[in-house]
């Protein structure tokens, strides 16, 4: 574990840490289309949630796991988070604004009483990490805002949305209210992943 960062996890294609490997920092995720992950190393301050294609979810704390195939034979999604959090809402952001580059805008998501996460349009998923709530299936409200990255940094959307973790099936869902900005849409991609799109400015 000496070469593994405290906030880093490494997933491997073969058992006993062999074959191709991928490094994950806390707040990131890996979507494995082939289902071919067989072992992993988890940093001291990390927690890794892994879903199998059959819906099974397993959490791994800091340590080495040379063979995960008995519990997760066909890995689907790998989510790396800080150890003090329970789950992550994985969000990617894009836009449909004509004449603008894919990465012209920035989405900020701020969960209630937590630090915000900034997500540039056109990129991969970023994790909005959520602690365990009481009760565990409580909703948490998140403030969202979208602005252009270039000067003058004009704001084009402001609003809020609710997310909820369901322990019985280890999935994250969302609920829109009147606070959701009308020029945006959100689509649920999988058990923890969502795409937010800025439709117009």
UniProtKB/Swiss-Prot annotation:
Compartments in which it is found: Cell membrane
Single Gene Ontology MF annotation: calmodulin binding
GO terms under cellular component: cell-cell junction; external side of plasma membrane; extracellular matrix
Induction context: Expression is controlled by rpkA.
Major localisation: membrane
BP-aspect Gene Ontology terms: calcium-dependent cell-cell adhesion via plasma membrane cell adhesion molecules
Keywords: Calcium, Cell adhesion, Cell membrane, Membrane
Main function: Mediates calcium-dependent cell-cell adhesion during the early stage of development.
UniProt record similarity statement: Belongs to the Dictyostelium CAD family.
Full protein name: Putative calcium-dependent cell adhesion molecule 2
Classification lineage: Eukaryota, Amoebozoa, Evosea, Eumycetozoa, Dictyostelia
Gene name of the record: cad2
């Amino acid at each position: 574990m000496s070469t593994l960062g405290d906030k880093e996890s490494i997933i491997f294609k073969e058992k006993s840490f062999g074959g191709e490997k991928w490094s994950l920092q806390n707040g990131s995720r890996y979507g494995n289309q082939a289902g071919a992950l067989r072992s992993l190393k988890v940093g001291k301050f990390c927690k890794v949630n892994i879903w199998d294609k059959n819906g099974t979810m397993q959490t791994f704390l800091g340590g080495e796991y040379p063979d995960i195939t008995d519990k997760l034979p066909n890995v689907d999604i790998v989510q790396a988070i800080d150890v003090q959090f329970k789950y992550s809402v994985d969000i990617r952001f894009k836009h449909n604004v004509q004449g603008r580059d894919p990465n012209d805008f920035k989405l900020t998501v701020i969960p209630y009483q937590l630090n915000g996460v900034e997500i540039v349009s056109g990129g991969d998923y970023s994790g909005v990490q959520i602690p365990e709530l009481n009760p565990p299936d409580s909703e948490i409200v998140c403030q969202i805002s979208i602005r252009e990255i270039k000067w003058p940094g004009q704001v084009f959307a402001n609003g809020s949305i609710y997310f909820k973790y369901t322990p019985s099936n280890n999935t994250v869902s969302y609920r829109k209210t009147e606070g959701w900005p009308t020029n945006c849409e959100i689509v649920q991609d999988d058990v923890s992943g969502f795409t937010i799109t800025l439709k117009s400015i």
